[in-house]
């Protein structure tokens, strides 16, 4: 069992609370792992009620996407050191990771102009190997509570997908070699399907939409390979809008 708290609560949660629970003699299962996060500062200042410089999550989700905020706080959160939250940095991360990299990869694959269905074709063996390795690497990081590194591995897979797409040039094969076009789109779609598994803890609202569009079952922590034709006559809606 994991117990998560801020670093200012370490003495209470590691000594006083366990002592109180033991004194009750109710055979409670005490935490196996203590997780203490660092502080989130805002614009280089500690959050202070007297200064009124705090921003609540409820206020943030009124203006910004909840999955985007969840992703930012896990991928760039105060894991081992205090972080300085600024709106500029948050917006840059949102637009870079979620719009330019992830969103663009999905859009150019699933919303390819003229694409009516994704057919089971030949999966790129090297990409398949990379996906399998990512599950192992990410799992180890999560078990060690190194969430930032886990997220970095996911972004790396997205970048691998984008690079593969660019190198394969499906916009040319669509006109000249439909078999190779199908292989490329099929491989990229399988990357997206597995990303929906890996990103489930971070952006569950968006991964659910991906699985629904691709007619996939619930997320599971193992490599999946699409084995049936998927009609994509209706465009996949944009997952993340660019913040200006």
Residue ranges, per PLM feature:
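NTP-dependent nucleotidyl-transfer catalytic core
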Residues: 1-7, 24-32
């Amino acid at each position: 069992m994991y117990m998560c708290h801020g670093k200012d609560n370490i003495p209470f949660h590691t000594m006083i609370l366990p002592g109180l629970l033991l004194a009750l003699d109710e055979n409670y299962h005490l935490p196996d792992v203590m997780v203490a996060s660092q502080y989130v500062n805002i614009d280089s200042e500690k959050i202070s009620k007297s200064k009124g410089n705090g921003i609540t999550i409820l206020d943030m989700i009124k203006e910004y996407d909840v999955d985007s905020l969840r992703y930012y706080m896990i991928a760039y959160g105060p894991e081992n050191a205090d972080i300085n939250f600024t709106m500029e940095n948050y917006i840059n991360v949102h637009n870079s990771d979620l719009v330019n990299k992830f969103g663009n990869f999905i859009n150019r694959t699933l919303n390819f102009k003229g694409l009516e269905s994704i057919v089971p074709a030949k999966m790129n063996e090297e990409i398949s190997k990379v996906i399998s390795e990512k599950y192992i690497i990410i799992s180890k990081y999560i078990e060690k509570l190194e969430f930032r590194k886990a997220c970095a591995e996911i972004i790396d897979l997205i970048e691998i997908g984008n690079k593969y797409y660019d190198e394969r040039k499906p916009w040319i094969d669509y006109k000249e070699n439909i078999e190779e076009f199908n292989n490329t789109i099929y491989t990229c779609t399988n990357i997206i399907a597995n990303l929906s598994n890996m990103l489930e803890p971070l952006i569950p609202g968006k991964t659910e939409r991906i699985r629904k569009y691709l007619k996939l079952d619930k997320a599971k922590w193992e490599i999946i390979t699409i084995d049936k034709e998927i009609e994509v006559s209706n465009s996949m809606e944009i997952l993340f809008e660019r913040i200006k």
